From Swiss-Prot:
Cofactor: Mg(2+)
Task of the protein: Catalyzes a mechanistically unusual reaction, the ATP-dependent insertion of CO2 between the N7 and N8 nitrogen atoms of 7,8-diaminopelargonic acid (DAPA, also called 7,8-diammoniononanoate) to form a ureido ring.
Reactions catalysed: (7R,8S)-7,8-diammoniononanoate + CO2 + ATP = (4R,5S)-dethiobiotin + ADP + phosphate + 3 H(+)
Protein name (Swiss-Prot/TrEMBL): ATP-dependent dethiobiotin synthetase BioD 2
Length: 231
């Protein structure tokens, strides 16, 4: 059984967190135990409990087990620390150990990335290098907006060039007034080398909703049944 997935996006703010939430809810409703994982979270805020990130808290809220925050988000960077101008090392061993620990506890771990596929960490390395090291299959979130076809095709190409399988993509309607939505979905369906596994409509406060019904796990049926897939 394929245990781990990496969620990337065509850009920042395209809906990786709500899609991660939807996938976790869909897997959970199918009787699987799940956990969300946000290895590196930028823009975190200081709280009485320590640094906290709103996206990581969403993932924590839909995980099957009651897990400490640090198990979901081992590296939480403040707004200041999130700038690439703020140089600091990233402990990739910590990220790998955290992922391995979660993988031992649940059936599936949904790993949410930071920004897009080539978004840089504070050490000026893209997180995708760690994803390649971990050999994680990739699901891509496409925020449906002007220019998204170009961004989606470039992201899919970059994932393939890195030797990882793109196992599916999800359309997230981030602009309810966008014309030609159906045409964009049709073009992406024809050009992307992976199946469309879900469409999320525009929903206010989507991160607080039940979203599992928008994910078609049947499109991942053969993928879920294997231990490892090749690009």
């Amino acid at each position: 059984m394929l245990k781990r997935f990496f969620i990337t996006g065509t850009d920042t703010s395209v809906g990786k967190t709500v899609v991660s939430r939807a996938l976790l809810q869909a897997l959970s409703s199918g009787g699987k135990s799940v956990a969300g994982y946000k290895p590196v979270a930028k823009g975190s805020k200081e709280t009485p409990e320590g640094m906290r990130n709103k996206d990581a808290l969403v993932l924590q809220s839909v995980s099957s087990l009651e897990l400490p925050y640090e198990a979901i988000n081992p590296i939480a960077l403040s707004e200041e620390e999130s700038s690439v101008a703020h140089s600091c090392p990233i402990n990739y061993t910590l990220l790998s150990n955290g992922l391995a620990s979660l993988s031992d506890k649940v059936d599936h771990v949904v790993v949410e990335g930071t920004g897009g596929w080539r978004s840089l960490m504070n050490d000026l390395r893209p997180l995708s290098e760690w994803v390649v090291q971990e050999q994680l299959p990739v699901l891509m979130v496409v925020g449906i907006q002007e220019g998204c076809i170009n961004h989606a095709l470039l992201t899919a190409q970059a994932v393939a060039n890195d030797g990882l399988p793109l196992i599916g993509w999800v359309a997230n309607r981030i602009n309810p007034g966008l014309a030609h939505y159906a045409e964009i979905i049709d073009v992406l369906g024809k050009k992307l080398p992976a199946p469309l596994i879900g469409e999320l409509p525009y929903l206010p406060r989507a991160e607080q909703r039940e979203l599992g019904q928008y994910i078609r796990l049947s499109m991942l049926g053969s993928v879920l049944a294997v231990d490892r897939i090749m690009a």
